[in-house]
Design a protein with these regions (language model features):
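A sensor for short, sequence-defined functional sites
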Residues: 18-615
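Sec-dependent N-terminal signal peptides
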Residues: 3-14, 315
Length: 615
């Protein structure tokens, strides 16, 4: 069997040159037994052969538990290259720690971990685990991960009472069969002979699941609900949050000391938000049912802290008392936000923000941030689906997105090079909207050291930061200004009488594409514009031996202009560069053009210029 399996993998590798295999998942079986909406049993068996140290990730095992999820069994058997059993581990030897740590977390989830990797390869693991759950909205099955793993046989089985409704979505590669016996329906899903899929950069967000199971009805700690529609799920969330909006008049007087009768909705929202930013502290609370159910507004106001649910509920309650319409909005936040299908209601949310309709001029509020201005969503929550919890139920909407010309970075740099090759760098910049989010300088106000920031965003090697000032301006069009002065002793490289240098010392700000071919469309979720002016002041009696050519490229997805001109007020040269690329989806047929566009920018950025003595 082992020789047969290795032969299959060898044939596969020959037909897929350049692809190495670090591990072979010989077999994986997942079985879900639905006893009731409050009782689920999940049994997972896996046999995996680990061939290289890179495949050791399969030997780093973990599972999590909380009030509603309990692991009943975890057994690991380790076999050496000869197939002999050399070790056995059970759940009692796993190390336990809190899933979330820190003063700003209140959570009952615990993670158990164990590393059973071995120094000698190959070796084989047989893993068996049994988990009991008390609730389930859905189940996504996606056992395929790394490109360098071969999967021989994968299967998923779910058995349930025949009258329990289940929405099933499968990948086209999946074999799906079903049976009905003694009022129990079983669905069987199978996939075999597959290599892991390499994820292409800047791709469309889509479901990564081979199989997705959505329970039409569910029971969460006694709260029964439905995923028949977004509306029904929103109604269930409303019930979960019912009677949590109580807030007394004394609290209202503290928020609006001068009254609110003469204020418009926007002004009322701003005062409420200012109060929350000033007086409330963010604490993540996911203990038990608190993972989905908010604390009461009055309790949050009195305690002075809350999680995203509680702070959003507090502001929503404040606005309700002053006759301003607002709705909590469930959202999948972060750069790795979940894929949401408008036609497939489910619970893929991990955060809550607030939506204030404001008579059609919608205001969005990130209630957990003490820095974000009113009506500005950063790249943490922008440009994605959110579920508004309206009195009529859930309503799926899209959060605002910003255009490429709004996410603007304008930077002015002067490089004064001495005859010894040292340089004095004067850098001034203004970042707007999401360009500010991408700027490393935003970390300065979080206490990061100046030298660390400079090393992160430049290729400078030996420098002293003489001055760094960062100012942020809060508004619905937020911006940040930076003033920087650096002395670098090794900016140039001396070769005979020449001084070699690269004027563009910024790094990692544009998309990079390595592969020569593309199988999926290219998707820029956000667009940006960068305008750089770099003045290079030559040392006395030196000049450039060759001036770079100007360049201008315009495409459907972006543009690039580079101009080179002599300075009139000093001995030197000015580089003016403008780069922009637009948000949007572009067909894979355009990949070569897009890759070439950014390759050209990268090549120009790395250009080596030479200063030589004047003749």
């Amino acid at each position: 069997m082992r020789i047969e399996l290795l032969l299959v993998v060898l044939i596969f590798m020959i037909s897929h040159p350049g692809v190495g295999v670090d591990a072979i998942v010989e077999k994986e079986e997942v079985s879900i037994e639905v006893i009731s909406l409050k009782n689920f049993k999940i049994h997972k068996k896996q046999r995996v052969q680990i061939l290289t140290p890179e495949g050791d990730k399969f030997a780093r095992l973990s599972y999590a538990e909380d009030e509603f999820i309990r692991n009943r069994e975890f057994v690991v058997r380790v076999y050496d290259a000869s197939g002999d059993l050399v070790d056995t581990f059970t759940k009692n030897v796993f190390e336990r720690e809190l899933l979330f740590k820190g003063a700003n977390y209140y959570d009952d989830a615990q993670v158990y971990s164990l590393d059973v990797s071995r120094q000698n390869h190959p070796y084989t693991l047989e893993i068996s685990s049994i988990t009991h759950r008390e609730w389930m909205f859905d189940f996504s099955w996606n056992p395929i991960s790394s490109e360098s793993v071969f999967y021989k046989e994968l299967s998923l089985t779910i058995s349930r009472p025949a009258d329990l409704e289940l929405e099933i979505y499968t990948n086209s590669r999946i074999q799906h069969t079903a049976s009905l016996e003694k009022k129990v329906r079983s669905d069987f899903f199978k996939l075999g002979g597959s290599l892991g899929i390499k994820k292409e950069p800047f791709g469309l967000k889509k479901s990564g699941s081979l199989v997705e199971l959505i329970f039409k009805n569910f029971d969460y700690n006694g709260y029964r609900g439905s995923l028949e529609s977004w509306e029904s799920f929103g109604l269930w969330m409303n019930e979960l949050w019912r009677k949590k909006s109580n807030l007394n008049e004394k609290a209202l007087a503290e928020i609006y000391p001068d009254g609110f009768q003469n204020l418009n909705d926007s002004a009322k929202a701003k005062l409420a938000f200012d109060c929350i930013k000033k007086n409330m502290r963010y604490v993540a609370i996911t203990y038990g049912i608190g993972g989905l159910q908010t604390a009461s507004a009055q309790k949050t106001f009195q305690s002075g802290y809350g999680d995203c649910k509680a702070l959003t509920n507090l502001m929503c309650s404040i606005l309700d008392m002053v006759d301003v319409e607002s709705y909590p909005a469930l959202i999948s936040a972060g750069k790795n936000d979940a894929w949401i299908d408008p036609n497939r209601p489910t619970h893929n949310f991990n955060h809550v923000i607030l939506c204030v309709p404001n008579q059609g001029d919608t205001i969005w509020v990130e209630c957990t941030s003490q820095n974000a201005p009113l009506n500005y969503l950063s790249d943490f929550t922008d440009n994605r689906f959110a579920l508004l919890l309206t009195p009529e139920g859930g309503k799926l909407v899209k959060t605002p997105s910003y255009f490429y010309h709004e996410n603007l970075a304008s930077r002015n740099t002067t490089l004064s090079i001495s005859s010894t090759g040292e340089v004095e760098i004067f850098f001034e910049a203004e970042y707007e909207r999401l360009a500010m989010e991408r700027s490393v300088f935003q970390l300065k106000n979080a206490g990061y050291q100046d030298e660390g920031l400079i090393r992160y965003f430049t290729n400078l090697k030996s420098f002293e930061v003489e001055n760094l000032e960062v100012e942020e301006y809060a508004s619905d069009n937020p911006r940040m200004t930076v003033s920087l002065r650096i002395h670098d002793r090794l900016f140039t490289k001396k070769m005979g009488k020449k001084l070699l240098f690269t004027p563009f010392f910024y790094t990692g700000q544009f998309p990079a594409f390595e592969e020569e071919e593309r199988t999926e469309p290219i998707y820029f979720r956000r667009g940006y514009t960068y305008v750089d002016t770099i003045d290079v002041i030559f040392p006395t009696r030196m000049t450039l031996d060759k001036f770079p050519e100007s360049r201008s490229v315009e495409t459907d997805f972006g543009g690039y202009q580079l101009e080179t001109n002599l300075l009139s007020e000093a001995e030197g040269v000015r580089f003016v560069r403008k780069v922009y690329y637009k948000e949007g989806e572009y067909p894979k047929e355009n990949y070569s053009e897009i890759k070439g566009f950014f390759d050209t920018i990268k090549k120009d950025e790395s250009i080596k210029l030479a200063l030589i003595p004047k003749s």
